[in-house]
Regions:
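Conserved ABC transporter NBD signature motif
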Residues: 88-99
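P-loop NTP-binding/switch modules centered on Walker-like glycine-rich loops
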Residues: 194, 202, 206-281
Length: 334
């Protein structure tokens, strides 16, 4: 067999059996102008997201973790078209997301839905669940003859009965309200769900129920998740792959098991050590600094106990030779 024919056959099998990339971030940046107390002074630039690169394959569950202000929710807003990237491109099913939105907004939102952090706040308090679902169905352009069957189907998916259709949001517990929000998101049969801290406002016991439900639906319905969270235990439970962000930049990414058991970046180590454990004494000694974050080097430099002058230069990127999907950006991996 000639080399050209081998390449063609190889490409065929690769495309046939490898999952399709459903969402792709290509060098995405997002900047904001901060508010200034003096009208005459120059407004400083806040770099919320810097050089974000990620390919999300169909059926995957990617977790995006980091402390508050690292750019997680900004990413979610850009995926939903609520914010535009300052630089770079976001592709959905190989088409530029912003073009997709401008050409057919309804089609895009049928494929991409979002579940928010506070379930009750994201539901109209003046409407019953039935009315909320009806509005979503009309908005998504779902055929009239499918209305009842779609509602029954999504309620069954989230383990709720049809009786809740006549109830108002304030009549539900936090867990029930979040199930309603998930059901609403499923009405249009989306391919991608963006979940922004979907269980952080719930009790721990209720969190477990919702996470189990989300994992079950992903496997049964073939959904893809972009899961935004600051809770590492939640991400470990539901996400197959994880991105760790700090100050708008990716510092480590890869399979979730690798991130938790064989992490390389000092910030990932700090995040994992910050999780409280009953009976374990609190450790001190982590470096706290008010130094500005370097523009070119590692953003964690001012707080890192392993930092050297080389960290102020362009960040060093490396990966696990046994598992190239596990990548980190650090000159001195732990």
């Amino acid at each position: 067999m000639s080399s050209t024919r081998k390449e063609i056959v190889g490409a065929f099998f690769w495309s046939r059996f490898m999952p399709e990339v459903i969402l792709s971030f290509n060098d995405v940046h997002k900047d904001y102008l901060s508010h200034s107390s003096e009208w005459w002074s120059k407004r400083p630039l806040i770099k919320a997201v810097q050089g974000f690169d990620l390919d999300v394959e169909e059926g995957d569950s990617w977790g995006v973790v980091g402390e508050s202000g690292c750019g997680k929710s900004t990413l979610a807003k850009m995926v939903m078209g609520l914010e535009k990237p300052t630089q770079g491109k976001i592709l959905f099913q190989s088409h530029e997301l912003l073009n997709h939105l401008s050409e057919n907004r309804t089609s895009f939102y049928r494929s991409v839905q979002m579940v928010y952090q506070h379930p009750t706040a994201s539901l109209n308090p003046r409407q019953t669940v039935g009315q909320i679902f009806q509005y979503q169905i009309q908005r998504m352009g779902i055929d009239d003859d499918e209305h009842h069957s779609r509602v029954c189907e999504v309620l069954e998916n989230v383990h709720l009965s049809e009786e809740i259709l006549d109830r108002y949001p304030h009549e539900f517990s936090g867990g029930q309200a979040q199930r309603v929000c998930i059901a609403r998101a499923l009405l249009s049969k989306p391919k991608l769900l963006v979940l922004d801290e979907p269980v952080s406002a719930l009790d721990v016991s209720v969190q477990a129920e919702i996470l189990k439900l989300l994992d079950k639906m992903r496997k049964e319905l073939g959904l893809t998740y972009l899961f935004i969270s600051h809770d590492l235990a939640v991400v470990e439970q539901i996400c197959s792959k994880t991105v760790v962000m700090y100050a708008g930049k990716i510092v480590e990414s890869g399979p979730t098991k690798k991130i938790f058991k064989n992490h390389k970046h000092p910030y990932t180590k700090l995040l994992l050590e910050s999780v409280p454990v009953i009976g374990k004494p609190m450790e001190s000694g982590n470096k706290v600094s008010v130094e500005p974050i370097p523009e070119d080097g590692c953003p964690f430099y001012p707080r890192c106990s392993h930092a050297t002058e080389s960290c102020l230069e362009l960040p060093f990127s490396s990966n696990d030779k046994m598992d190239p999907a596990h990548q980190w950006r650090c000159h001195h991996p732990v």
